[in-house]
């Protein structure tokens, strides 16, 4: 069996258009120290008081930043990430909690989802961290966060079911914390984290339907699952691929592969995204041909689908997953990058209140949230829009986009125990060592 991997820091250097996008995102967002401080502050003041999701911003951006560092090895970026990790560690309560929800309203709404992103942000940082001492502190923080959750969520007496920690989408958002727990088990090898992962998997990711069993049976397409929020559903299957690595039960890999196969058959559009009804799966392989001025093709979905495909590629080596990443990257993903410095003054930033919503002015973001499939204007609305302090605001897609750019970079070339595979037509230089010999691969390409 071939053991596939992507680049480690320093091996790969992309050039041309891909590098332009990487440098733009790094300068515009990932080295903005004020933005990082603002994200961490949401945990210190518990700013999500009414079921919001500002707690996802830090971890989503951190994951993308770490993947960007792996693909580009920008040392200024690394220093900024060390600084924000230190800041986040200072936000941890004595109990182990790191949450934007106050304790008296915890484990509701998006709380588990946001905790997932804190853990994932730290876990991805561990993959680039150069300090053994800092690594130990981060792992200790992760264990405290996870143990706090395990003590309160589960099947035991006086515990809350994970499917009761959110009333949204069958609690798929909460169940997607699986990936974080499996990764933590992979680092610590402490059994309780794998046991908690098994508890999540055994529940099937939703209060309303066992998504794993449905994917194994292929009786329904994902848009027929009932809870059809694409991003959260895909995030659960990302966790399942990680779970498979340790339990080695082929049915879990098969479920994830079937899920992607069914998505591609029923909900994969010409630009490589899914869902033509806002952020929902809706048989968009077909519905993409219907004219619509509504928002659709969410950037969060594009990136998450790319990440899921990259995980399945590393497990299987199947080139079809690279075909999917290629379509998504060169169309929906790159098209969503605001590298032309649009002001976004006409992009709606909606703040919802009891009797409706109102719009607020906001800064331009590095990524658009949605992509039209007809001749139309981009940037109609900010996805997951949240107002914070200091006159600043942000959104979910603005945070996740950097991961999509980085995944496209890393997918360019892979190594395995038998050689190398050039997967995407990008300009790059790749240097590594193979069987004691120095290897250099170079490609000069024009993406478009």
Regions found by a protein language model. Give the residues of each.
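Glycan-recognition and catalytic cores of secretory/periplasmic carbohydrate-active enzymes
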Residues: 1-448
